[in-house]
Amino acid sequence: MSKKKQKNRSLPGTGSIITSAVFLALVFGFSLAGIASPDRKFSEMENRSLQQAPKVSFEGIKNGSFTEEIESYMSDQIFLKDELVTMKTGADTVLGKRFMNGVYLADDDFYIQDFQENSQQIKTNIDCLNEFAKGLDNNIEVDMLLAPNASCVLYDKLPAPNQCGDQHKTAEDIRAMLDPKIHLAYPEEALRTEAEECYYHTDHHWTSQGAELGYSALRQIMELPAIQKYERSVRELDNFYGTLYSKAPRTGAQSDTIDLVTYEGNAITVRYPVAAGDHEIPAECTEVNGIPQKEGLFVKAPESTKDKYAALMGGNFALTEIETNADSNEHVLILKDSYANAVLPELCAQFSHISLIDLRYYHMQEESVSEYVKSHGINRVIYIYNIDFLNTDNNFVWLE
């Protein structure tokens, strides 16, 4: 009798067989679906091009690049990848997890990017900004708009406990490092007065409201009058889910609205002399003397995609040049990150000649930045950077 019971215990139960069968069916089903479905070329969720099937070559096998490409291909082309990632985020949230892929799921449906100070990188970058400023002619004004991130202004919305760094302290360290020639505008206090309106719920950028408060602080240190010549109007882009959402997508996340700000009556022409950047030259452009140019700051194509923030200027480019009918005839050079794009409506209402250089893509094109200053008669330089960018970017070495 005991032998019979022992024998029965060694046999798999019906439940185990069903579980195994379902698991195998899912594995083979997803594999077959992945094989049958066409490869995706672009992920709107991740806002990037996806790895395509690599070509087999002896050289690729020898140097290991083929193995790396095939691994990327298999990862990028997982069947229903976006839906599976969303399901995982939902499951992690149910289990009480509030920090995923460098992003905090904060109060009031805010996604807030983590911040950990890299003091050495900040010092390197500030040294580059200082040396560039000191190398300019004495009659060239140098101003800086330093934008705090949501982890600073919305710190009280972070889950407790958390390991997020103190950006306020970092900002004070930056202030102490800056050369006296650089006039600093740091709008943390002003942003706190309208904190929830100054940052997107799902993206790492500040909103048009935040950018306007930032510009107000910058305008005051430049001792310039408020904009009075033009009437401000706003067009809304709804259903925006930004880059932080893509890192931890979840069902029911609150979407954002992007405000496209226009100062009515301000005629703006934008030129794209250098094509390098994170997007293609806008389709609205026509070539004038061999240089693509368009009217107005906004680009139509991104408005119908997930990448709606790129509606501002069409993205970030090595060099763009803007002409407006503002009263000031100063020739202004703005060294920038993507936070600066949201400030452009105000800048264009203040200055008639603006050049924008993004050091991530401007790598000594035809002339160095210093040479550009001289050849284009620049008489004011403005740095516009957010703290996290200064903390992580390593392209300031191109500032010569």
Spans of features found by a protein language model:
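Extracellular glycan-modifying ectodomains
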Residues: 1-400
